[in-house]
Amino acid sequence: MAFDYKEKFSVAGKKCIVTGAAQGLSRGMAEGLLENGAEVVLMDLQAEKLQAVADEYCKMGYKAHAVAGDLSKKPEIDRMFAEAMEILGNKLDVMIPAAGIQRRYEPWEFPEDA
């Protein structure tokens, strides 16, 4: 009997968040989830670009939502995730934290909250 990976790893109906989703690999991962039946909250710093991406996916019939903000700032993280969880009905099945955030510190100087 062959292993049915499509059923075992299905994301149909799953609630997902993908950060950095306005472009690049993150956008590709979000698109893969959407194409396979997931509802996805797209997050990125680039608000206009992110909204255009979400609108494009919605026109294709996918359940895509844009939540823009700066994931390098704790208050913004809290706001963004509260908004995302409200959109997703307080359910989260898949989280892809793929936003590229660069901070330059020596390893011994890196703040605990960064």
Per-region residue spans from a language model:
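The beta1-alpha1 cofactor-binding region of Rossmann-like NAD(H)/NADP(H)-dependent oxidoreductases
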Residues: 47-48, 68-80, 112
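Glycine-rich phosphate-binding loop signature in dinucleotide/nucleotide-binding domains
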Residues: 84-91
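Rossmann-fold scaffold of SDR-type NAD(P)-dependent oxidoreductases
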Residues: 19, 92-100
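Structural signature of beta-strand start/N-cap positions in the alpha/beta core
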Residues: 15, 39, 63-65, 91-93
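Canonical Rossmann dinucleotide-binding motif of NAD(H)/NADP(H)-dependent dehydrogenases/reductases
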Residues: 5-41
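Conserved residues in the N-terminal Rossmann fold of short-chain dehydrogenase/reductase
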Residues: 42, 67-68
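Conserved mid-core segment of classical short-chain dehydrogenase/reductases
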Residues: 78, 102-114
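Conserved glycine-rich Rossmann-like NAD(P)H-binding loop of the short-chain dehydrogenase/reductase
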Residues: 36-53
